[in-house]
Amino acid sequence: MRSSRPFPFLLSTLALTAATLSLGSAMAHAAVVEGGGDVPPVSHAPMGEVAVRRGVQGPAGLFTARIHLLVNASKNEFGKPTSLAPDFYYSLTDSVQIGLLHTLPMGWQTLPGAGLCLTGSDKGCATVYNNVGFDFMYGLFYGDVHLSFHSSLFLLRAPDPLPAGVMWTVGLSGKLHFTDAVALLFDPQIGISLKDRDAYKDMLYVPLELQLQASRAVALKLLSGVTGQLSSLGDTYQVPVGLGVVANLTPNLDLGLRFSFDNLLGKVPAVPPGLSRTDLRSLGLLLTIRS
């Protein structure tokens, strides 16, 4: 029998999101600027510093490479798999950004195995090259509330005999600035399967980052969110919890590290038999290059 819990769970999620948006708007100290033209800078600091104060898109002409090394750190499975997932972004204007992705819609919290899998089929790699995505963002608001329309098209590869998949995601990416040093990054998206819908289900992705500017060059992040199948969200939702740190080394270079419990607060059946919630873990190394 189909569970009746997804609908109340989704209502609760939407209510929490609405409350958070209202709180962020109430705490804003500067006017919100609509996108479409030149966007005023949020900081005159060198590129990469005071990153928490910045928005979700780069200024016109900025090229950014975010290179992720994703490592399974689960009990008895360390490094199985390990994958390399580079993301590339280019800002055509202050309001329009395009990208080529190898992470999935959970961003930095994408699980190991995405992108180019390095450890072989006997160590957790279903295929060598698992997914690629094409990303588009359009800035709507700037200031103490950054908000962008966000959409991606993902091509998903599966091991034989499973078919390849195509998923289109649509949502809003934004950042609520509570102070100059504290912000909440959110990027909720609905993933719609465009091919082989029996094998690939429509999905919900809600990555969240609570960001704290510890110093001009160092940002701390509390990572969480929700992901699951829309048709059975109450039975499939997963909630990761993690910590991350990103250090700005030069105006062109950042280095980051995260550690996550991949389903610390999610649905229990997602945990394989014999493992506890804390046994499912992953590491993410991040190298960011700007030019």
Model-derived features: where do they sit?
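Cleavable N-terminal export/targeting peptides
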Residues: M1-H44
